[in-house]
Amino acid sequence: MEEISTPEGGVLVPISIETEVKRAYIDYSMSVIVSRALPDVRDGLKPVHRRILYAMEEKGLRFSGPTRKCAKIVGDVLGSFHPHGDASVYDALVRLGQDFSLRYPVIHPQGNFGTIGGDPPAAYRYTEAKMARIAESMVEDIKKETVSFVPNFDDSDVEPTVLPGRFPFLLANGSSGIAVGMTTNMPPHNLREIAAAISAYIENPNLSIQELCDCINGPDFPTGGIIFGKNGIRQSYETGRGKIVVRARFTIETDSKGRDTIIFTEVPYQVNTTMLVMRIGELARAKVIEGIANVNDETSDRTGLRIVVELKKGTPAQVVLNHLFAKTPLQSSFNVINLALVEGRPRMLTLKDLVRYFVEHRVDVVTRRAHFELRKAQERIHLVRALIRALDAIDKIITLIRHSQNTELAKQRLREQFDFDNVQAQAIVDMQMKRLTGLEVESLRTELKDLTELISSLEELLTSPQKVLGVVKKETRDIADMFGDDRRTDIVSNEIEYLDVEDFIQKEEMVILISHLGYIKRVPVSAYRNQNRGGKGSSSANLAAHDFISQIFTASTHDYVMFVTSRGRAYWLKVYGIPESGRANRGSHIKSLLMVATDEEITAIVSLREFSNKSYVFMATARGVVKKVTTDNFVNAKTRGIIALKLSGGDTLVSAVLVQDEDEVMLITRQGKALRMSGREVREMGRNSSGVIGIKLTSEDLVAGVLRVSEQRKVLIMTENGYGKRVSFSEFSVHGRGTAGQKIYTQTDRKGAIIGALAVLDTDECMCITGQGKTIRVDVCAISVLGRGAQGVRVLDIEPSDLVVGLSCVMQG
């Protein structure tokens, strides 16, 4: 290796390459941090933004004037202040003018400045811009020595180290940037709330962050949306870091055919709507989110943001919303990092820090402005006094000037004879003849008076820190009054810790109806009006000529509904997964929801809150066979189904109830037999077993239902001709499994066979439904409590050609 020679007059100093790399990287890092990525806490601007606004101010591109080509603006910034790429300057200029990027844009754009959908702005040779009116407050008083200036990159000009910034840019518009080893991500806020917080701080500098939070509710994003939870907001205000969950704002519209459409009118901050629509479409095509028929971005200047998600008929909008929030940016987290430069060094800042540093900056600006104005006023009053003296002795002064050979001699004589100084003498010799009028003399005397008052006011201001703070407070209030507006982002207290369907679905009692031909729907219980015993009922379904309601059940929207078919297979759905329909609609076919074979019917429905090994599904077949299986055996059933009960040839499953191990059950037959027995008499079995004999039947009798015994309740039976009664459980003694049971009802042709039974409280209501779709909702207390052998009372006045086919208890709450 060739030996390096020592330069003439120089010294070679050996250094460690590791040390040099570290030093160079730190220098580079600090350059990026200070000169590029992080905003100054005082005016809230990064250097490129500050240079853009200052260059536009220097070129007179104020709001009252015309716009100028962005190419010219970018060129001015590059040539005088920012020796970097033109793309970075133009990108920064564009962002300052986007109303979806900044809460209060400081650039007034002309032309295509990009869209929220990610469309790029037009090239800078096509677009124009000028300062927005609010931006003028950022540079106001900059000519009054309110801020310090430094030489530009080539010493050909000077640029401000900070702008006067009467408008609290950092709090109002936030900031984002990535430096070396650090990043900032500060949210925007509402200007009126910021002004209130600044006023509160000025009045009481010792106030707590919580008291500041009483003024500033939270971030206010330009794209609106809804913030969920206040913990993240509070944490970010107290520590400078926090996570804020934002969701899109939406409405749900239903067309005449019952199809729902979800319309999003606001999205979380910084969400690209084009990518969002593409993401929703991909999820819909991949069947990750089911039920979406179409999605369109209908955003326009006339309608504003509008993303339309059309759903297939029968699809619950709440379920789709849940998936959209979970799998797309329609719910996003804004990670707050309040990092800004304080005296040239990056610092993590609390809300109070941000307010304090802004107030301190404005105090410095107001103070420096007052000193400048005081100096200018003193200089002017010095001249005005001289001019007034000169006008009072105008004849002598005119004679003196006329007899002077040149200007310098005239000024010398003025100094000697009238005791004027150089500045005053120069002003007198420069005075125009029009100033000799009486009106001008009076004007000077008025100006002298005004200047005297101004000087007194400024001197008083500079000696009173409280008055300086008062000016800061007033000017901030004036900005808020001029440019402040209502909040765009709402805040709700609910925290979102995890996403679940139930988070979006109101708990509500639903009536689930299944027709003989397999149509299923859910209808809110509130849709049925209460009627007295003997009422005519109201239509519950608009069914085909040969169809009729065969099953009716009530459950909460958050419950699981287990369907057990005539062939002994089990399926389940969440209640909200069953399409909701009006009372007159027939609903959706069961085969569109469950994978039910063509030769099986839903014959039993069980509602349960959760699957467990402590609870059982107790099933009964038409031929009296019973079986008990823990509910956790059915976790995987879902819509594809699994075996629940192995049936003998010709037998069908007719009923099932949810029981605990210690419960007693009662089997009731169509011809009026009731067997009360202990549930322990039936051992726990696996899903593939056939069950055991539960009740001994005659050759013509069949099981009509099975109940869980509760002494607080009574047995309610209903016959096919609309007669019913209540009987106390205490009238039945416990018998062994496989016995015939006791009499509960005597069947007659006029009243018909038993079609169903319920265990009810006096405060319950029951619902009956006929094969022709008529329903009646009746208070249980209106149905008489009778003995085991009584025939019952008329509950439903039905047509001779109609029969009661279903009975259900309507749960309260």
From Swiss-Prot:
<dbReference type="InterPro" id="IPR050220">
    <property type="entry name" value="Type_II_DNA_Topoisomerases"/>
</dbReference>
<keyword id="KW-0413">Isomerase</keyword>
<dbReference type="GO" id="GO:0005524">
    <property type="term" value="F:ATP binding"/>
</dbReference>
<dbReference type="GO" id="GO:0006265">
    <property type="term" value="P:DNA topological change"/>
</dbReference>
<keyword id="KW-0067">ATP-binding</keyword>
<dbReference type="InterPro" id="IPR002205">
    <property type="entry name" value="Topo_IIA_dom_A"/>
</dbReference>
<dbReference type="GO" id="GO:0005737">
    <property type="term" value="C:cytoplasm"/>
</dbReference>
<keyword id="KW-0238">DNA-binding</keyword>
<keyword id="KW-0799">Topoisomerase</keyword>
<dbReference type="InterPro" id="IPR013758">
    <property type="entry name" value="Topo_IIA_A/C_ab"/>
</dbReference>
<comment type="similarity">
    <text>Belongs to the type II topoisomerase GyrA/ParC subunit family.</text>
</comment>
<keyword id="KW-0963">Cytoplasm</keyword>
<dbReference type="GO" id="GO:0046677">
    <property type="term" value="P:response to antibiotic"/>
</dbReference>
<dbReference type="InterPro" id="IPR013757">
    <property type="entry name" value="Topo_IIA_A_a_sf"/>
</dbReference>
<dbReference type="InterPro" id="IPR005743">
    <property type="entry name" value="GyrA"/>
</dbReference>
<dbReference type="InterPro" id="IPR006691">
    <property type="entry name" value="GyrA/parC_rep"/>
</dbReference>
<keyword id="KW-0547">Nucleotide-binding</keyword>
<dbReference type="GO" id="GO:0003677">
    <property type="term" value="F:DNA binding"/>
</dbReference>
<dbReference type="InterPro" id="IPR035516">
    <property type="entry name" value="Gyrase/topoIV_suA_C"/>
</dbReference>
<dbReference type="InterPro" id="IPR013760">
    <property type="entry name" value="Topo_IIA-like_dom_sf"/>
</dbReference>
<comment type="subunit">
    <text>Heterotetramer, composed of two GyrA and two GyrB chains. In the heterotetramer, GyrA contains the active site tyrosine that forms a transient covalent intermediate with DNA, while GyrB binds cofactors and catalyzes ATP hydrolysis.</text>
</comment>
<feature type="short sequence motif" description="GyrA-box">
    <location>
        <begin position="531"/>
        <end position="537"/>
    </location>
</feature>
<dbReference type="Pfam" id="PF00521">
    <property type="entry name" value="DNA_topoisoIV"/>
</dbReference>
<dbReference type="GO" id="GO:0006261">
    <property type="term" value="P:DNA-templated DNA replication"/>
</dbReference>
<dbReference type="GO" id="GO:0034335">
    <property type="term" value="F:DNA negative supercoiling activity"/>
</dbReference>
<protein>
    <recommendedName>
        <fullName>DNA gyrase subunit A</fullName>
        <ecNumber>5.6.2.2</ecNumber>
    </recommendedName>
</protein>
<keyword id="KW-0046">Antibiotic resistance</keyword>
<feature type="active site" description="O-(5'-phospho-DNA)-tyrosine intermediate">
    <location>
        <position position="126"/>
    </location>
</feature>
<dbReference type="GO" id="GO:0005694">
    <property type="term" value="C:chromosome"/>
</dbReference>
<comment type="function">
    <text>A type II topoisomerase that negatively supercoils closed circular double-stranded (ds) DNA in an ATP-dependent manner to modulate DNA topology and maintain chromosomes in an underwound state. Negative supercoiling favors strand separation, and DNA replication, transcription, recombination and repair, all of which involve strand separation. Also able to catalyze the interconversion of other topological isomers of dsDNA rings, including catenanes and knotted rings. Type II topoisomerases break and join 2 DNA strands simultaneously in an ATP-dependent manner.</text>
</comment>
<feature type="domain" description="Topo IIA-type catalytic">
    <location>
        <begin position="38"/>
        <end position="504"/>
    </location>
</feature>
<dbReference type="Pfam" id="PF03989">
    <property type="entry name" value="DNA_gyraseA_C"/>
</dbReference>
<dbReference type="GO" id="GO:0009330">
    <property type="term" value="C:DNA topoisomerase type II (double strand cut, ATP-hydrolyzing) complex"/>
</dbReference>
